[in-house]
Each structure stands twice: as structure tokens, then as C-alpha cells.
UniProtKB/Swiss-Prot annotation:
Pfam families: SpoIID (PF08486). It comes from Bacillus amyloliquefaciens (Bacillus velezensis). The lineage of its organism: Bacteria, Bacillati, Bacillota, Bacilli, Bacillales. May act at the level of sigma-G activity or its stability. SpoIID is probably required for engulfment. InterPro entries: Bact_Sporulation_Assoc, SpoIID/LytB, SpoIID/LytB_N, Spore_II_D_firmicutes. It comes from the Bacteria. This is Stage II sporulation protein D. GO terms for cellular component: outer membrane-bounded periplasmic space. Residues 37-51 have a biased composition (Basic and acidic residues). The keyword Membrane does not apply. NCBIfam families: SpoIID_LytB, spore_II_D. Residues 35-59 are annotated as: Disordered.
Amino acid sequence: MKPIVFLLSGLCVLILLVPTILVLPFQAEKGAAVNREPGHKTAHTIRETKGAEPTLKESPVSVPVYRTSNHSVENIPLEEYVIGVVASEMPVEFKPEALKAQALAARTFIVRLMVANSASRPRKGSLVDDTQMFQVYKSKSQLKKEWGSDYAQNLKKITNAVAGTQGKILTYENKPIEASFFSTSNGYTENAEAYWTSAIPYLKSVKSPWDKKSPKYLATRTFSVPEFQQKLGVQLAGQDTVGQITARTPGHQVATAVINGKKLKGRDIREKLGLRSADFEWKRNGGTITITTKGFGHGVGMSQYGANYMAEQGKSVTDIVKHYYQGVDISEADSFLSKYMAKK
């Protein structure tokens, strides 16, 4: 009889202990998640919305935009402004994740201007104009004329991309970044200091091999010798030579070239000749000079075609922006918008 009593007692103790043993590891895990160091910053990502479409919420602020067509300032709700920029700056045929990346860049660009101590304003009462001097913006009526019968489906696609990133911007060390972008790289993006004047830690050269599939990857321009000399302010030596490319940048663009003893920057050559990029090769054939370029744009920041090809391979908007903008976070724009409203 006693053995049975002991057996029953042991079973009772075991029944009481098992739930406690099972629960303890989960309590420890919850505690570890809660007890973070003070000031810990969680990096945000953009969640993919499968099935249900995101809803575009009312914008907390408006952007005063100088409309060059009628010479007036129009106050456009922030997210509506981003829609007009994405629709104008990136082909609507691009993949949704690429359009989201463009929306993040566009929103970051304007929020950065909002909180800047000094900004180049096109007209009194405006923050930006609607040209490429800032960001190209088109209204819905303009887009309707441009898209015709495709207007409804195109607008829906762009709106979904903007809604999927609404309220989010790109930051570095808790500040909105210089979210520069361009059409097509030569296979690499460019260091900021190689094209502009100052180094920017998140704008560093990265590989972008997908761009070789872009329809804008290669281009050719032909100049007469007199035209070439006049545009660059040089005199060519000999009958068959042009000059020597003497240095290239980290992004494989021309840094410097020498033409008959005169040293020129690759960027200056590009701009004076109206070339698509500063990655070029030249060849003289009698009285003409043929220049072949790789890529389209300054090369600093996000390649739009590269972003689209990444999206085609299944990469997310987070993957895209963190590839082209090194070390950035995806952050809420609210605190920056509050500062802007306080300044007003």
C-alpha cells in the first residue's frame, strides 16, 4: 500500500512542477526583449503588404511648391506631393518595390529641405519648384493628360507605392539624408566627394551590375573637331589624337583628362559636351570625335534602373535603399515635420 501512496505523491509533485519548468524559459525570453539598453534605436523596415492594399492617410503638412507653368505657389499635401514626384521621376512600369524606394527618396528630400536652416528657395513663399532643380512634380491633371486611358491604373500603382512607405524617411545619425538618385550607373555608383565637393558617409561607391541591362547604359555622341575644341576651350595636337584619360574615380568615371597639355575634370567635360555620364571613352576619326558613355546621370546615390532590377530579383524596398545609401535607417518623419510646423 505504501509504495502506491509514494507513487501517487510523486506524480502529484511532477504535475505541479512541469508547468513551471515549461513557463520559465518563455518568461526569461520576454524579459530579455524588454530590458534593452537606454536609448536603443530599432531600425525600421518597410513591411510588404500582400493582399490588402495600403491606405493613404491624410498628410500632416503641405509643401509650398512654385508652379512654373502659371507662376504661382500651390500648397500640396505632403503625400500628394510625393505621388506627383514619383510619377514624374521614375517610369510607372517599374516594379512596386522600386517605386517605394523612389517614394522614400522623394519624401526624404523634401523633409530634409523643410528642416534645413537655410534652403535655396525658388520664389518667396515656396519651398521648392516643380522642376529638376529640386524634384520634378506633376499634378494629377497633368498626369491624366500624359497617361490618357492608363491614368487610373497608373495612379493606383504609384499611390500604393507611396502609401506603402507613408510617414517614413531615410536618416543617418538621426538626420534626413541627401537622398540623391539618378537614372543608370556604369556598373558602380559614385562617391559623393568624387562628383561634388564634400564626402558624405552614406553616399559611397557600391556595385550596381544590373544597370548593364538598362536601355540607357550605352550612348554615343559625335562632334566635329572645331565644335569639340570650342566647347572645351582646347586645341587638339596632331591629326589622330584627342587626349589622355589620366585618372578615374572610385566609381570608374573619368576624374581627369589631359588634352594637349591642358588638364580637365571629367565632370567638366561631361557638362560642357552634354554627355550622359562622366564614364567615357573617345576616338578621333579624321575631322570627327566619337565619344561613348556608360551610364546616365551623376552616379551618386540610388540608381533607378538598378533599383528596378533589384526589385525584379525579389529584393525589398529596404534591401534597395540600404544598398545604395550605406548605413542609413528608415525612420518616422513625424518629429521632423513637427519641427517644420514649429518654425512656421
